[in-house]
Regions:
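The beta1-alpha1 cofactor-binding region of Rossmann-like NAD(H)/NADP(H)-dependent oxidoreductases
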Residues: 41, 62-74, 106, 245-246
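A glycine/serine/threonine-rich, flexible loop-to-helix segment
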Residues: 49, 179, 191-235
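Substrate-binding pocket helix/loop in short-chain dehydrogenase/reductase
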Residues: 99-101, 107-113, 139, 232
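Short C-terminal tail/terminal secondary-structure segment
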Residues: 2, 95-98, 240, 250-252, ...
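Conserved glycine-rich cofactor-binding loop
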Residues: 16-17, 40
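Catalytic loop of short-chain dehydrogenase/reductase
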Residues: 140-165, 170-179, 191-193
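Short, small/polar-rich loop/turn modules that mediate ligand/substrate recognition or access, typified
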Residues: 178, 183, 262-264
């Protein structure tokens, strides 16, 4: 099925690994031209290189999304390379470290707020301004099942709260910008695991503590299939781990005109661990 994304100017934040890698490759495969906005320029270039034989063009613009000036510069470079932004995927986000709430420092909490809330704000405000002016565009915010399923927010309550903000923000903005032709939707990942250990950068959740605690991607896949997993798949009707392309598929749908009558919506890509 042709999603009509060929030549669409697309910005994907946090596109250097994990879910971001899947998003970049998915959009490039559909012919979209992609800017990878990431702090890890080296890892971002590895993803761009992996996409070199796909129909869409991919470039890397090293960006700290918590810095408004850096975001404005990135959006300007994207426009120079591929034209005005058609699609924005706010994927950059993360947990500083799983910690019981009363033990979490204010500094660590602020890190999560800056990345997960202000990063989305800066990118949406900057790229969205042009969308509103042109009367078209699609914004997809990658949230988390930690904002939907209490078990998934265990020791990451602050992170789940920031993602809950993004959900509410998305609905409000969808209502405000709908008359201007701009749609805003959310994709909420469940347990999504990279295909390979080296598909993520040094600053990722997986590198910092995920692999040490949960095992390698292959080990997690085996544990989920056998029912022996020590992570949040025990209540999933679909007994497998999610992969980055699962998030990409849902995001591509929201980016395309196949979803042209959908805005303010959220889909949980979690094997059924959350149902609405």
């Amino acid at each position: 099925m042709d999603l009509g994304l060929t030549g669409k100017s697309t910005i994907i934040t946090g596109g250097s690994g994990g879910i971001g890698r899947g998003l970049v490759l998915g959009f490039a495969e559909e012919g979209a031209n992609v800017v990878i906005a990431t702090r890890d320029g080296q890892k971002g270039q590895e993803v761009a290189d992996a996409a070199k034989d796909l129909p869409g063009d991919v470039i890397v613009v090293p960006t700290d999304v918590t810095n408004l000036e850096a975001v404005e510069e990135m959006v300007a470079k994207s426009a120079s390379a591929f034209g005005p932004t058609d699609v924005l995927v706010n994927n950059a986000g993360g947990v500083f470290h799983p910690t019981p709430f009363l033990e979490k420092s204010v500094e660590d909490a602020e890190w999560e707020v800056n990345l997960n809330i202000w990063g989305v704000h800066h990118c949406t405000r900057t790229a969205g301004k042009g969308m509103v002016e042109r009367g078209q565009g699609s914004i997809i915010n990658i949230t988390s099942n930690s904002a939907l399923v209490p078990e998934a927010a265990n020791q990451v309550a602050m992170y789940g709260g920031t993602k809950g903000f993004v959900q509410s923000f998305s609905m409000g903005l969808a209502y405000e910008w709908g008359p201007h032709g701009v749609r805003v939707n959310c994709v909420s990942p469940g347990w999504i695991v990279p295909h390979k250990e080296d598909h993520v950068g040094e600053g990722s959740f997986w590198r910092k503590y995920g692999y040490d605690f949960f095992g390698t991607p292959d080990q997690m896949a085996d544990a989920a299939a056998s029912g022996d997993a020590n992570f949040n798949v025990s209540n999933q009707p679909i007994r497998r781990i999610g992969r980055p392309e699962d998030i990409a598929d849902a995001t591509l749908f929201f980016a395309s005109d196949r979803s042209k009558h959908l805005t303010g919506q959220l889909v949980s890509v979690s094997g059924g661990s959350y149902m609405a």
